[in-house]
């Protein structure tokens, strides 16, 4: 099982960062390796989203069910994809009116096989830089 824990302190509100991370369809604009993203269903408390990843000739897609607690947490659970196990969460901790700690925690493992090994390398590269990508996107949208 692979675990990823990343965080950043940003001069933006928890609301701004929640909205940015929850804008799944914008991911291909700023997330390295994400070539497609779509919201399949949303009702305000939950979102079903699909991400298409591609890098180095390897492509994989997966779908998550996201539980939304506005401006606090987005919990991710796997609906469909190459994983044996997958769970995670984005957390938004307000530190002041215009300061927030954003955190990403992911735990995942892939099904066996050669394709899974390639998918694991792709996913490791993409997820390892997610928080950095969100930081850059926030600076682009909200200023520095």
Model-inferred region functions:
Residues 1-44, 144:
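Hydrophobic ligand-binding cavity/cleft-lining segments
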Residues 3-5, 59-63, 85-88:
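Short, surface-exposed coil-to-beta transition loops
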Residues 7-11, 38, 52, 65-67, ...:
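Generic structural detector for well-ordered beta-strands
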Residues 14, 41-45, 67-71, 91-101:
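A short, structured loop/turn motif at beta-sheet edges
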Residues 38-79, 133, 137:
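Glycine-rich portal/gate segments that line the openings of hydrophobic small-molecule binding cavities
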Residues 78-129:
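Beta-strand/loop substructures that line and gate deep hydrophobic ligand-binding cavities in soluble
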Residues 136-144:
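Short, highly charged C-terminal tails/helix-capping segments
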């Amino acid at each position: 099982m692979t675990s990823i824990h990343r965080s950043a302190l940003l001069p933006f509100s928890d609301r701004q960062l929640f909205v940015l991370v929850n804008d799944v369809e914008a991911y291909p604009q700023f997330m390295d390796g994400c070539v497609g993203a779509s919201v399949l269903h949303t009702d305000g408390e939950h979102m079903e989203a699909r991400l298409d990843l591609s890098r180095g000739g390897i492509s994989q897609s997966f779908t998550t069910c996201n539980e939304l607690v506005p401006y606090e947490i987005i919990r991710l659970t796997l609906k469909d994809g190459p994983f044996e196990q997958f769970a995670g969460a984005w957390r938004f901790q307000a530190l002041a009116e215009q300061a927030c700690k954003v955190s990403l925690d992911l735990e995942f493992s892939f099904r066996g096989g050669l394709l899974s090994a390639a998918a694991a390398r792709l996913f490791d590269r993409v997820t390892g830089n997610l928080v950095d990508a969100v930081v850059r996107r926030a600076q682009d949208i909200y200023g520095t």
